[in-house]
Design a protein with these regions (language model features):
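Ankyrin-repeat-protein effector appendages
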Residues: 18-36, 120, 152-181
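Alpha-helical adaptor scaffolds
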Residues: 71-74, 78-82, 86, 92-120
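Intrinsically disordered, low-complexity regulatory segments in ankyrin-centric signaling systems
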Residues: 17-54, 63-66
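Ankyrin repeat structural motif
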Residues: 44-52, 77-85, 110-118, 143-151, ...
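Ankyrin repeat A-helix N-terminal signature
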Residues: 38-43, 71-77, 104-110, 137-143, ...
Length: 181
């Protein structure tokens, strides 16, 4: 009986091995996106290069609207940011909250990356969903060198968000918040 069961198991495993594996296209797409976004977070330029060479859509978004460029900038991966920009990634892309790669880099204090992103053709006064600009982030986080560079690029440092905050006010430490309810 043991020999029969072993033989049956061997035959079944052979049949299973030889059977074609059905692949769910949506599952494959999700797995590729996970690899792509993980490569951006880790700064894995060779992996990003594989995606670029295969024609993968550089501005693919995750569930929060993040692109690989936004993730690479936020996580301080300068070589990945450079490679994605060189391949044509959209530097002006916004996540679901309207934040850009530049805003993420300023928030995280990634000054080299922020400078590189400021060299793109994006408007220096691009606003997020809360009405904030990159200059407001630079003012809030006291990134005065970036604030000066944004001003030189044409940013309006007196532009206000809906609460009345401007880059100039934020840089001076004046922060307006919503009234308590």
């Amino acid at each position: 009986m043991r020999i029969f069961l072993l033989g049956l198991a061997a035959c079944l495993s052979t049949l299973t091995w030889a059977a074609p594996v059905e692949q769910n296209p949506e599952a494959i797409k999700a797995q590729l996106q996970d690899y792509y976004f993980d490569a951006a977070r880790r700064g894995d330029v060779p992996m990003l290069e594989t995606f670029i060479e295969s024609g993968y859509s550089l501005d693919t978004r995750d569930s929060k609207g993040y692109t690989a460029l936004i993730l690479a900038a936020y996580h301080g991966q300068a070589p990945a940011v450079e490679r994605l920009l060189a391949a044509g990634a959209d530097a002006c892309a916004q996540d679901q909250r309207g934040n850009t790669a530049l805003m993420g880099a300023i928030f995280k204090g990634e000054l080299q990356i922020a400078r590189r992103l400021m060299a793109t053709d994006c408007s220096p006064d691009q606003r997020n969903g809360a009405g904030q600009t990159a200059a407001m982030y630079a003012g809030l986080f006291k990134r005065l060198e970036l604030l000066d560079a944004l001003k030189a690029k044409g940013a309006d440092l007196n532009a206000e968000d809906p609460l009345g905050n401007s880059a100039v006010r934020l840089a001076s430490g004046e922060i307006r918040t919503a009234a308590p309810r």
